[in-house]
């Protein structure tokens, strides 16, 4: 039996690009609290994403998925959500989308996956405050982040 070839995926590429913007605090889910109940991401917030659509190019291997992005922040020990901290993460992502000369870059994916070349990144709407969180987390949602990319062939 042969080992399957690992291919770059929209989630992996978007996570890798977002890490160039907000650092190593991006994943598809929020990290679980530690054994002592502490949140490892409380100081700087956290970014989660989920695939929301997009259409691969019909003729060339160019991908342009749309990702739903949520920016999270928390004040441990307080019932007051830190809206400013979550908003700053969303604003950092928006600012990175406007920095057109810095966007084209090759991003490294997890071991075994080929690299991907990000060609463009842009949002499809303004971020908005999500106020229905009973846990007192602050959350801003970006309705669509499009990261245009192609897999780098060795």
Predicted regions and their residues:
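A structural signal for short, well-ordered beta-strand segments
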Residues: 67-69, 142-148
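Acidic-leaning, charged glycine-interspersed low-complexity segments
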Residues: 95-143, 152-154
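Short, solvent-exposed beta-alpha or beta-beta edge segments that form flexible loop/patches at the rim
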Residues: 25-82, 123-137, 152
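Extracellular/virion structural assembly segments
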Residues: 74-105
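Small/polar-rich, solvent-exposed N-terminal microdomains that initiate assembly or binding
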Residues: 1-59, 100-116
